[in-house]
Amino acid sequence: MLSLIKLQRVFNVHQVPKAFHEDGIISGYRHPRSSATECVWSLFQLTNETLNVWTHFLPTWYFLWKLMTVLLMEDVWNEAYTWPLLVFLFSCCVYPLASSCAHTFSSMSTRARHICYFFDYGALSFYSLGSAISYSAYVFPDAWLSSSFHAYYISVAVFNTVLSTSLACYSRLGLPLLHYSHDIVERFSERQCPRMSKVLRILAFAYPYLFDNIPLFYRLFVCVGEGCTDNEANSVHVQHTLLAFLTSFLFATHLPERLAPGRFDYIGHSHQLFHVCAIIGTHFQMKAIEMDMGLRRSQLLASAPAISFNNTIGAALLCVSVSLGIICVYSLPLLYSSNPKNTANKE
């Protein structure tokens, strides 16, 4: 099969539009006007995006297997206690799949690149909500069960998801309806303000993560005495937390390629490492959640607020609907703005 694949030409950073540039990456860029077929074939040759795709596409199947196992082994239709885990596992399938698709098809055009990453951001925001829903059901420390914070936790997490998707999309192109019929380049763009775009994007995902983990951080690092939920899952939660901060560090710093531009273009650059750390961290997060779910089942069913459709699947459906609406609002100006060829050339 590989012998039938026509290898695509790769380009250096000076041969592609600035919208496609990555910090510290000098070579290995695909053609910025690739067809969908060429994008797929490019996954079977080494470019600076190849491992970005595979490091998320392959783990998607692992998380899908975990999801299907729960669906087949548990009485999910009648057992509401499993619903938060289902939402979390589904979000674990969605975010790496959306990421791998974004990295695959982002070289079709400037517009396609933006839209692909809009969906990527929406999927990451949905994953943050999936984490919050599972934390509310299984991870909250005993001392905080049925507290006022617990009562509003999911509602705030839903709002954070909407805010995260909006801010992340804004970080690429600014307000979506500003200069609706004008070229993209006339609006705020990542190309014009790369540092501000990076700060906004980090904020868009750091804030929901920090909020989601308030009960976990309190449980692990602050709480002493009774009501602190000290069990075997805590050490696994710590592993996930360390990997989450390492993931954030790699995403924010672009190390090691910033120290040696061109050395890590194909293998070993920060985005690949960031993907690997994120997936391993998600694995430990899933393991810790499943441990808490089993170890604390009787206590949570007796003391925690009742798990309902509204605070699990309903919240997830609302998040998906609103995020898709936000993505559409940000994407429409790209699809209908004037002079598409000129816009692509300027970008």
Swiss-Prot record:
GO terms for molecular function: signaling receptor activity; steroid binding. GO terms for cellular component: membrane. It is a multi-pass membrane protein. Pfam families: HlyIII (PF03006). GO terms for biological process: oogenesis. The chain crosses the membrane at residues 53-73, 82-102, 115-135, 139-159, 202-222, 236-256, 315-335. The keyword Nuclease does not apply. Keywords: Developmental protein, Differentiation, Lipid-binding, Membrane, Oogenesis, Receptor, Steroid-binding, Transmembrane, Transmembrane helix. Residues 1-52, 103-114, 160-201, 257-314 are cytoplasmic. Belongs to the ADIPOR family. Steroid membrane receptor. Binds progesterone. May be involved in oocyte maturation. This is Membrane progestin receptor gamma-B. The lineage of its organism: Eukaryota, Metazoa, Chordata, Craniata, Vertebrata. The gene is paqr5b.
